[in-house]
UniProtKB/Swiss-Prot annotation:
Gene behind the chain: queA
Subcellular location(s) of the protein: Cytoplasm
Keyword Transferase carried by entry: yes
Principal place of residence: cytoplasm
Family of the protein in this entry: Belongs to the QueA family.
Protein name in UniProt: S-adenosylmethionine:tRNA ribosyltransferase-isomerase
Keywords attached to this entry: Cytoplasm, Queuosine biosynthesis, S-adenosyl-L-methionine, Transferase
Subunit structure as annotated in this protein's UniProt entry: Monomer.
GO CC terms of this entry: cytoplasm
Amino acid sequence: MPTPLTLADFDYHLPPELIAQSPAAERGGSRLLHLDAASRLHDRRFPDLAGLLRPHDLLVFNDTRVIKARLTGQKATGGKVEVLVERITAPDRALAHVRASKSPGPGMRLRLAEAFEAEVLGREGELFDLRFPAPVLDLLDAHGATPLPPYITHAADATDERRYQTVYAREPGAVAAPTAGLHFDQPMLEQLAAQGVQRAFVTLHVGAGTFQPVRVQNLAEHIMHAEWYTVPEATVAAIARARAHGGRIVAVGTTSVRALESAAAQAQDGPLAAAQGDTRLFITPGYRYRAVDALLTNFHLPQSTLLMLVSALAGVEPIRRAYAHAVAERYRFFSYGDAMFIETPAP
C-alpha cells in the first residue's frame, strides 16, 4: 500500500528572484511550459498555445472581477486599521479581514480612507461583519486599492489596476485575480475563436484564502477555505457540445477547475448540471477529475493547495520534474509569472 502523501511532498526550493513582481510588458508576452500527455516537457511562448488547441476544444474562463478590496483608516480610538473586504453579502454589508493592534468589537466604527465610516456588527470566525454607509462596491471603487498578493512587494498602482485583471472580467467579487487568464489579450481570443476553439465562462470569486498556507502535515486534516462559484446552464451546454464533437474541456486556471469539479460533485454520478454556492472542494492526488481534460495555469507556491490540485491532474512526479525544470530555466513564478499548459496523462 503506498505511503500517504504529506505536506512535505509538495515542497520545492524557489529562489526569491524568480517571483515575478510585475507583469510581462504585454499580455501574452510570457513563457509557456507545456507538459504533454506523455509527461514530456516543452519550452514555449504563450502565443504557442493556439497551436496546442484544436477545433471544438472548449476554453472555460473564470469571469470574476477583482474589486478594490483594500482600505486603510483608523478606529475611533485613533489606532490604525487595515480592512480587506473578503465577500460582499448585501449592497451595504461585507465580511472583511480587519488588521489592528486590538480587534474591534461590535458597535465600533472604523473611519476608512478619510472618507466614510463602517460599523462593526459582529464576527464570523476570522472575518468581521461590516455595515457601510453606501453601496460597498461604490465605496471600494472610489476609495479602495487593488489587493495584490502578499509576495508582491510594491504598493498597487495604476498598472496593477489594469494588469491584475483579465480582459474578460465582468462579475465583481474577487480579492485575487484568476491569474492564468491574465495572459490573454483580445487578439489572442479572436485568433482562437477563428480557428474553432470555443469558450465558456464560470464565476468563482477568489478569496484571500487562496494565499493561506497549509499548516498540517496530514492533508486530511486541512480545512479548505470557502469560495462562492456558479456554473451557468450555458456553460453546461457548451461542455456537452464540445464533448459531442470530440473536443477537450480546457480549464483556464485552477479557479475554473474548482468551479467545474464542484458542479460535477454536485451532480454526483449524473450528468453535469448548472450549479452555484460555496465550495470547499480540496483536490489532492488520487482525486478523479470528472469535468476537466487539460489545464492552463501559472506556477504555484510551495506546499499550497493549488500545487496539490495540479499534481492530482498530471501526477506528483511529472509536476515535481516540471517545477525543477522551471526553476533551472529561470521561469517567472506566481501571479505575474509565466504559464503552464498541462494535458492529462495518456491512459
